[in-house]
Amino acid sequence: MIEKYIQLSDRIFFIDFGIHVDDGSISTIFNPNDNYNIIVFPTVTEGINWEMFKDKISANSTEPTNQMGLSFDTSVGSKIVDDYYTVKCTNARSWVMMCKPTLKNVKCRRSGNVQIHPKSITMFEKFKERGVKIVAYTAANITITYAHECIGNIINSVGIKAN
């Protein structure tokens, strides 16, 4: 689907299910941008890494306590400018692509075809291999809603008895 719209659009803004992007991050999508091809908005992965939390507390980390045990879907490298960092690898659930400059890098020179891998992490790896400039906007305030099954619904399912 991205192959179709990358050739027809100026920008593609992808938001996965359950993701909410704040207004400040939305404004970065519409700002003129000649320096980066793709901007990813790093999000927290589900769960808390209690070992990492314990290690950071023991090491007197200056990181904010509310994010010490969290893992993110994007690994960042060096700082470019305020709130923008290079991306080492990502499995981003929210991102914006500037189509024209990205298309120049991903279009096959011989056939003119565009092939984009359907898996997010592989897609971004292939983009980096082809010279697409991917950056992370770390000031993004992303809210994620995780869907889960209520234990009451599981207990009341057919064939399950609760004593």
Residue spans of the language-model regions?
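A short, glycine-/small-residue-rich helix N-cap motif at loop->alpha-helix starts
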Residues: M1, V21-D22
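Active-site nucleotide-sugar/metal-binding loop of Leloir-type enzymes
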Residues: M1-R11, N31-D34
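Short amphipathic alpha-helical segments and helix-helix/interface helices
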Residues: I2-E3, I26-F30, S120-E125
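Short beta-strand-to-loop acidic/aromatic patch adjacent to the donor-nucleotide binding site
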Residues: L8-H20
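Short, Asp-centered acidic motifs that coordinate Mg2+ and/or phosphate
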Residues: R11, N37-I38, I134
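Short beta-alpha junction loops
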Residues: I19, V44-G47, A139-I142
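Conserved catalytic core of nucleotide-sugar-dependent glycosyltransferases
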Residues: D22-G112
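C-terminal catalytic/acceptor-binding lobe
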Residues: T86-N163
